[in-house]
């Protein structure tokens, strides 16, 4: 329904459709996001499109000031999850092009229209549009075709103690632990230090006991360690990660066990459950404790947050 919309908004919806965006992004909100990415106000034409760096809140302000469309402050997540995420995956917008290493979900996050997309859209409503659109689409897959592709993230390997090696034995559980160390940690704990990795052929596959002691934690022989423990020096966080292939996730009972086991930690505790895929995660969804994070190995560049005010961080 486009009745009552400004012509720029109506045309932006048509552009999104022609670019191959799914129906969920062929709407007024997404059209206004596209207009804000190019700073196209009511008095401007497509040929006047620009490429400013712009965050979610400024986008919402743009909608209100220039098109009289006011969104509630709690709509920010809707903008992010149901429009801008798809724009980035489609390659029509860039995420933090000024600083790619900016942390996930930083309040300083910004977006920018992608250069080729900008040049194409400048030609909308001209005789060249159809030909240029066909050429543009032939050089890139549309979002519908590549929706499940992960976005690239800058990755910094986790550090292990000098002179130590980790041996991963074959098996689904060990493979997931390997993915946590090689895929999860570089994305979400860049520059982190591995303290413990269990179930790698030995009961104590890898254990930097001295570093853990320096953080105020001494584990007795009866304490059931999580599968992976990583220290994040930059944030002074200690991540306790359970890898789930057959046994359960960090549920309420396990949350309490780990809290007691790591009670002396001088670093803030972050609880994470890792699954190999979303179908296995779905089986355990009702058991996952609140105030934890969930990571799925087959979608490594995404993190699922269970409640609370922080996206990733310890709870006091």
Curated annotation (Swiss-Prot):
Its cofactor is: Mg(2+)
A GO molecular function held by the record: magnesium ion binding
Q: What is its EC number?
A: 3.1.21.4
Source organism superkingdom: Bacteria
- Any one Pfam family here would be BsuBI_PstI_RE_N
Q: Which Gene3D superfamilies match?
A: 3.40.1350.80, BsuBI/PstI restriction endonuclease-like
**Keywords assigned:** Endonuclease, Hydrolase, Magnesium, Nuclease, Restriction system
Query: Which InterPro entries does its entry note?
Result: BsuBI/PstI_C_sf (IPR041963), BsuBI/PstI_N (IPR041454), BsuBI/PstI_N_sf (IPR041962), Restrct_endonuc_II_BsuBI_C (IPR009528)
Which reaction does this chain catalyze?
Answer: Endonucleolytic cleavage of DNA to give specific double-stranded fragments with terminal 5'-phosphates
Q: Name one GO biological process term.
A: DNA restriction-modification system
Report the enzyme's class at the first EC level.
hydrolase
Indicate the family of this protein: Belongs to the BsuBI/PstI type II restriction endonuclease family.
Q: How does this protein assemble?
A: Homodimer.
- Put simply, this protein is called Type II restriction enzyme BsuBI
Tell me which species this is from.
Bacillus subtilis
Q: What is the lineage of its organism?
A: Bacteria, Bacillati, Bacillota, Bacilli, Bacillales
